[in-house]
Regions:
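Nucleotide and nucleotide-moiety/phosphate-recognizing core
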Residues: 1-135, 139-149, 154-171, 177, ...
């Protein structure tokens, strides 16, 4: 069984408003991510500080962040605490161009380590597969004041998938309004 946890707890500071709800061709950004996850995953969860604002999404389960702080590792911690599977897919809610094929690819390539995409030299820590076994290390990292996802995955160790075929366009995070304009120009949506 493939469980997917979409992390939607960011602050959207650079975007100026909640980017997960920003409309892209008549759909909120997060809905594009959810629909691709639903193509290939058995269960899809949205993890957020205020999950009720995603109640319009069909076929997903909403989870409230366990930790009060608003940062990506809080969502990851919630997902690791919730799952009863050995591993899970983690996606960021601000990547509307992701494709189900990429989710399937990283799932098939993952074993018992964190597995992430590396595209054009950049690691994407919020598009990958995480084993449940990293939860205790994450707890220690958080207790020590750690906040950065990349710092955490470097501490634990990870594997990468680099061959994304024709899907390199999918690795755009929507952090600014300019990013949204770029995404809207790509004829994939």
């Amino acid at each position: 069984m493939i469980e997917c946890y979409i992390l939607a707890g960011g602050q959207s500071r650079r975007f100026g408003e909640d980017k997960t709800l920003f409309p892209l061709k008549r759909k909120p950004c997060i809905q594009w991510v959810v629909e691709q996850a639903q193509r290939v995953c058995d269960r899809v969860f949205v993890v957020a500080k205020e999950p009720q604002k995603y109640s319009f999404l069909k076929g997903v389960e909403l989870l409230k962040d366990i930790l009060q702080e608003q940062f990506a590792l809080a969502g990851l911690y919630t997902a690791l605490s919730h799952t009863d599977q050995d591993r899970m897919v983690i996606l960021s809610a601000d990547m509307p161009l992701i494709k189900g094929e990429l989710i399937s690819l990283i799932w098939e390539r993952s074993k018992n380590k964190i597995t992430l995409f590396k595209v054009k030299g950049k690691i994407f820590p919020l598009f990958g597969v995480y084993p449940k076994g990293v939860k205790s290390t994450l707890e220690e990292y958080l207790k020590g004041g750690g906040l950065r996802v990349m710092e955490f995955v470097e501490k634990v160790g990870y594997e990468v998938v680099e061959d994304v075929g024709p899907f390199s366009y999918a690795f755009i995070n929507m952090n600014t309004k300019e990013d949204a304009r770029v995404i809207l120009k790509i004829e994939i949506l």
